[in-house]
Design a protein with these regions (language model features):
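Acidic/polar-rich alpha-helix caps and helix-coil junctions
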Residues: 1-140
């Protein structure tokens, strides 16, 4: 019953090799032209990452319940750090589909891969330090 699956997921094939993400289709006015800088769900997830393990469930559950997920799937108060990251990992994938935020979550937690990852490790995403930064900056 997760409302994110009904509206966000999937791509629409238009012509040739062009695919459009359904998440952003159909919005009109300013909502069709802008993507929010930060969303309430992201703030809740940041809180869930930073508070004590016994408190993280209330923030994750607030988002899950607002998305129509049954309270039977709520995160309890007796979670481990691994369980917290696993739950946040699942929620980031659903909440920030096609936005790029999930990539930063993976980098922040030094997670190397995800299901069907097209790149073996994230070293492919590390850009070299610019020469000016080596010459004039503090980089080595």
């Amino acid at each position: 019953n997760d409302m994110r699956y009904r509206s966000n997921f999937g791509f629409i094939h238009t012509s040739g090799n062009l695919f459009l993400c359904r998440k952003y289709l159909g919005a009109s006015g300013i909502y069709g032209e802008k993507i929010p800088l930060i969303r309430l769900a992201e703030m809740y997830y940041i809180l869930a990452e930073s508070v004590a393990l016994s408190e993280c469930g209330q923030y994750i559950n607030a988002v899950k319940n607002a998305r129509g997920i049954s309270r039977a799937y709520d995160v309890g108060t007796d979670v481990t750090e691994e369980q917290r990251l696993e739950e946040l990992n699942k929620e980031y994938q659903k909440e920030f589909f096609a936005e790029g935020q999930y990539f930063y979550f993976l980098k922040r937690h030094n997670m190397k891969t995800f299901y069907r990852c097209p790149v073996e490790n994230f070293s492919a995403y590390v850009l070299p330090v610019p020469d000016d930064e080596k010459t004039y900056g503090e980089a080595e």
